[in-house]
Swiss-Prot record:
Lineage, top ranks: Bacteria, Bacillati, Bacillota, Bacilli, Lactobacillales
Pathway: Pyrimidine metabolism; dTTP biosynthesis
Identification of the protein by name: Thymidylate synthase
Catalyzed reaction equations: dUMP + (6R)-5,10-methylene-5,6,7,8-tetrahydrofolate = 7,8-dihydrofolate + dTMP
GO CC entries: cytosol
Pfam families: Thymidylat_synt
Family named by the database record: Belongs to the thymidylate synthase family. Bacterial-type ThyA subfamily.
GO molecular function: thymidylate synthase activity
Subcellular location, record wording: Cytoplasm
Source organism of the structure: Streptococcus pneumoniae (strain ATCC 700669 / Spain 23F-1)
Active site: C154 (nucleophile)
Top class in the EC scheme: transferase
Amino acid sequence: MTKADTIFKENIECILKEGVFSEQARPKYKDGTVANSKYVTGAFSEYDLSKGEFPITTLRPIAIKSAIKEVLWIYQDQSNSLEVLNDKYNVHYWNDWEVGDTGTIGERYGAVVKKHDIINKLLKQLETNPWNRRNIISLWDYQAFEETDGLLPCAFQTMFDVRRVDGEIYLDATLTQRSNDMLVAHHINAMQYVALQMMIAKHFGWKVGKFFYFINNLHIYDNQFEQAQELLRREPSNCQPRLVLNVPDGTNFFDIKAEDFELVDYDPVKPQLKFDLAI
């Protein structure tokens, strides 16, 4: 069993046994009913990517390519346009969060990255002094939240540090997430930011190091308990999945494409489970 599968099952069991139910919940299912959830607070996990530990479960298939394309939309295109996401990347799951008829998700994610020139500033800081303790991406912008409607960012802060070990520089990353749908989005979000970490490491010719993942509110929606039990019953696949970025060291961050990533030794348990999403 991979480390990710162990953590996945432990988190599911913890939520089901020790979690509490939400109150005054904002999300709704497509039929208009309130989407309550059972949750725990302060969930933390750690993966050493340099040792082949990746935060992706084998207990069900994870759509890794779409997840990586979303990261490119946010940090390369620096866009909030659904047209860009749909037409350039053929990714459509954000359409349910369109703000009115704007064709956007509001001033969120990529729009905030562009507004503050976040990724260019980060790369410049890492180039100038990678050992400084201020290499942070933050998508939490109160002014933007007041200016437009839209879903507030779930994965909103990423911090980066470097370590020199045996002459090699390793890039570590810490992702902080305010809210996470454990069964649907947990491994998607984690692998998205592992991909971002790998892109930045490649830009500088560094090794990928450790990935730390903190979630403030980790939950299972009240229409997912049957799927949760099914995941607990499943035996994990006998594989060791890992994400590979097939570009040379020193490849410019903005030149990396979704097709450059390869998920190897990944044979997840099937069939896929179905989930009705909360919007």
